[in-house]
Amino acid sequence: MLEARLSQTLLLKKIVDALKEIIAQGTLDCSENGLELQSMDNSHVSLVALSLASDCFEKFHCDRNVSLGLDLKSLGKVLKCANSDDAVTIKAVDRPEKITLSFESDGKERTADYELKLLNLDQDHMEIPKKDYTCFIQLPSSEFARICRDMSMFDESLTIACSSKGIRFLAKGDLGTANIQLSAGTAMDVSIEVQEPVTQSFAGRYLNTFTKATPLADRVKLYLSDERPLLVEYPIEDYGHIRYYLAPKVNDPDF
């Protein structure tokens, strides 16, 4: 049986909002250690991975591993029925066909219970190779969201180039060229670690969708290496993260 309680529904709303634009459905794997979800988008270009430790919850009990097939858009609709400061408790029995979400207002003056049917999803759990990246960038998540938004006005592709001089974002299109460069420093709160220079191009619409996770974290981490997917990580305080993996485009433009 699973029982997990959060003191505020807001966190769960933010997580679902960060997932549902990439994947419509996903399997939430529950264990005594917490919750995990991993799934690819329909185009098999991007992979999203959620990890949330049991310590994140006000109360957490899972006496047997259980997998919950979720329709994320439907879950998002149920969460809209709750105020952001309501407490939420998620319950599921062994071999469940549904989950129960119970919302309580502060002071328990209002309670509401909703049942959500589960899906029978046949999803393979992909093993992500644990290899070191040659470039690591950390910057404010709001700045990354702004860059992705601004670049999308110029072209559907966004080129990221990382070197010892800093990190550059470039988009070229019919409208013209957009070129933004960031250097490591305290004023912009940007940190950059480079072992080898990397230049890769990515589909801008995916990067823009990744920034739906901005409300979850003040800072975002970018990891790049040649011939490897880009890793965009949003830490969820000290309790976990959402990670997005995005395959680079085959032909990078001259930079």
From Swiss-Prot:
Q: Which GO terms describe its molecular function?
A: chromatin binding; DNA binding; DNA polymerase binding; DNA polymerase processivity factor activity
Q: Does the keyword DNA-binding apply?
A: yes
* A GO cellular-component term linked to this record: nucleus
The record's listing under InterPro entries reads:
DNA_clamp_sf, Pr_cel_nuc_antig, Pr_cel_nuc_antig_C, Pr_cel_nuc_antig_CS, Pr_cel_nuc_antig_N
Which parts of this chain does the entry mark as a DNA-binding region?
61-80
Q: Which PANTHER family match?
A: PROLIFERATING CELL NUCLEAR ANTIGEN (PTHR11352:SF0)
Extract the HAMAP family matched here.
DNApol_clamp_arch
NCBIfam families in the record: pcna
Function field: Likely to be an auxiliary protein of DNA polymerase delta complex and is probably involved in the control of DNA replication and repair by increasing the polymerase's processibility. May function independently of PCNA during DNA repair.
Instruction: Please give the name of this protein.
Output: Proliferating cell nuclear antigen 2
UniProt gene name: PCNA2
